[in-house]
């Protein structure tokens, strides 16, 4: 029969092992659910993954929005004023989606060079843009530094 001290040590070691296993599972789940953000310039420079999900952010180019006859399928272009990424999306758009306004689309790049969006996020205020999109546009020289408000990171 194990001594009291031996049982306690075994119990503590088992608890630490279970805690380490739980932490490893949580970290693995978080890593597999990460969706990275890229500007259109970075997408064209092949910095974005060729397979897997990522986000593209910028402005919806004026005059680029085309709706299909079904009313749900949409094609438009996201630009950082330097480069452009064509986007195809099927679904309901946010009410604030507009040409010339900020947008972040999540999805993956098709073999034909068209980004297949599974989610479209539009800005929610006339002075707001997601921080990553604002930074990408500033780097491209499309936005003055004080034009937009962004969330605290």
From Swiss-Prot:
Periplasmic compartment residues: 30-153
One Pfam family hit: CcmE
Keyword Metal-binding: yes
Keyword list, A-Z: Cell inner membrane, Cell membrane, Cytochrome c-type biogenesis, Heme, Iron, Membrane, Metal-binding, Signal-anchor, Transmembrane, Transmembrane helix
Entry superkingdom: Bacteria
Localization of this protein: Cell inner membrane
TM segment ranges: 9-29
GO MF annotations in UniProt: heme binding; metal ion binding
Gene Ontology BP terms: cytochrome complex assembly
GO cellular component terms, semicolon-separated: plasma membrane
Record-listed heme binding positions: 124, 128
Topology in the lipid bilayer: Single-pass type II membrane protein
InterPro entries: CcmE, CcmE-like_sf, NA-bd_OB-fold
Residues exposed to the Cytoplasmic side: 1-8
Predominant cellular place of this UniProt entry's protein: membrane
PANTHER family per UniProt: CYTOCHROME C-TYPE BIOGENESIS PROTEIN CCME HOMOLOG, MITOCHONDRIAL
Function, as annotated: Heme chaperone required for the biogenesis of c-type cytochromes. Transiently binds heme delivered by CcmC and transfers the heme to apo-cytochromes in a process facilitated by CcmF and CcmH.
Similarity-based family: Belongs to the CcmE/CycJ family.
NCBIfam families: PRK13254.1-1 (NF009727), PRK13254.1-3 (NF009729), PRK13254.1-5 (NF009731)
Protein name: Cytochrome c-type biogenesis protein CcmE
Taxonomic lineage: Bacteria, Pseudomonadati, Pseudomonadota, Betaproteobacteria, Burkholderiales
Gene name, Swiss-Prot/TrEMBL: ccmE
